[in-house]
Amino acid sequence: MKKTILSLQHLLAMFGATVLVPILTGFDPSVAIFCAGIGTLIFHTCTKGVVPAFLGSSFAFIPVILAAKEAHNGDLAYAQGGIIVAGLIYLVMSAIIKKIGVDKIKKYFPAQVVGAMIAVIGLNLIPTALDMASHNFIIAVITLGSAVAINVFGKGFVKQLNIIIAVAIGYIISLMLGNVDTSFMSSSASFLQIPAFRLPKFSLEATVLIAPVVLAVFMEHIGDMTTNGTVVGKNFIEEPGLHRTLMGDALATIAAGFLGGPANTTYGENTAVLAITKNYDPSILRRTAICAILLACVSKFGGFLQSIPTEVMGGISIMLFSMISYVGLKTINDSKCISNKKNIIIVLTIMIIGLGTTYLGNKGIVIGIPITKTVTITGLSLAAIVGIILNRVLNRNEFKVEKKEEQSVLNSQLV
């Protein structure tokens, strides 16, 4: 019972974003939720069930899905085909990483790079939370204040339930003020429903539009896995391995493409729930996945979740996204890396590019590395690439030392 209640908190955290992507692109929200649940179970199978992560609809694919949809007269089946190919590219990348070894990848992601990337993920999400809260700041503040108060003064299991209790408080107040759409209760729709699954179609045009996005979301995946590992206190890049987490993401995305949903990706919102509750049991996320699958088939429950006011979710999201930023800054501080001026430059560069390009992008000014006419590496992905290269240049002496050590080990093995 305890784990089931905790899983509902993760369900609340992922619901808004997972439903928003299909609403923006035209996919069926019920199918998207179903795919999120199936994708999460696939991911946990691939990662030996040790990574407490939840997969939901990816925002990175929105512009290219819309472009593919427009190119095929509104037929999203071709976008599904492109999503499947993107997942296959993910699988190839997973195999390459397994071949060359994670150690050669890991040295390019020291604390000054990883910490700054994590902080950028959280800080870029906070404006979205504030926009949601702006629907009714009073209710948002009450919801946020309730979560903070329970987190500070709560004890034991009650403290772990701070998110779901805060949402309940915000929901009840909104209900009393008449701010909740209760039409789902009187709807004549049947209690159970089968999601409207749809088979994919393939075209070269849709594939060329969508597939290159994996180059951008690969960096986001590393950031998400590093954030998750930092919160839990484990190195998931090393064990179960980046190749396994990528494979899980790839197969989840392929499954979504075949079922008729948007591409899947690991969710920072659920990592923030882990940070707040301090409960890192991966089985709770698997229960959340099962709940999501059931939710996709129960129209009334889905209606209830969709009736939660935007401002209530905005208030909670402020706390969730702030926690992600805190984890990033804590990673930088704990490593003592900023005692080196070169590392300060790296941290600031990543944060300026990551936040600056996202801000300008919202103003219609796109700065980044163009991959295709519709795909540009910008925001976090661009910041990560620049940060990795800058770290390689400024700290090149450390790389030389590591190379000498590797050569010494190789020579000793030959002898």
Regions found by a protein language model. Name each.
Residues 1-32, 163-243, 369-372, 401-415:
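Helix-loop-helix hairpins and the membrane-proximal interhelical loops
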Residues 66-72, 151, 270-285, 291-295:
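Interfacial segments of multi-pass membrane proteins
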Residues 74-184, 289, 294-403:
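Membrane-embedded alpha-helical modules
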